[in-house]
Amino acid sequence: MYRHILIPTDGSELAERAVTHGLSLAKFVGAKVTGIIVEERLGGWLYTEQIKEHTAGVLDRVANAAKQAGVPCDTIHVLDVQPYEAIIATATDRGCDLIVMASHGRSGLSAVVLGSVTNKVLTYTKVPVLVVP
């Protein structure tokens, strides 16, 4: 079925639910996982250091959860102007056959409306996407 699942996260509560769901699915089907966090590249050394600390913590949580679930996992941090493009490119470059992501992230959008990143991934990717509400 699925062999390699990409799980984008931003560390939000909804994204964490998508991580949990993606890891459960990966364990069930025997797939490996790549956890990815994409941050927009913004200027300033201090802000960049804060981003590094935040992303390291988020990706460590993904890796630790995968280890506890017995799921092979690698993680990647990408700086990009368009997060959806980085998600799609990573899925393609790494041969992922499923993307599991939250309906929306830190933007605080209503659960009724898909987040802009999720919507753009759904619109432009050729890889199947499982959206977790």
Please report, for each region that a protein language model flagged, where it lies by residue.
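Short, surface-exposed alpha-helical segments at coil->helix boundaries
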Residues: K52-D60
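Structural beta-alpha unit
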Residues: K67-I99
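Small/aliphatic-rich secondary-structure junction motif
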Residues: R3-K52, A65-D74
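Short secondary-structure boundary segments
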Residues: I37-V38, A102-H104, P133
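Short, acidic/small-residue loops that bind anionic groups at enzyme active sites
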Residues: Y124-P133
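Glycine-rich, Arg-bearing micro-motifs that act as flexible, cationic patches
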Residues: L98-Y124
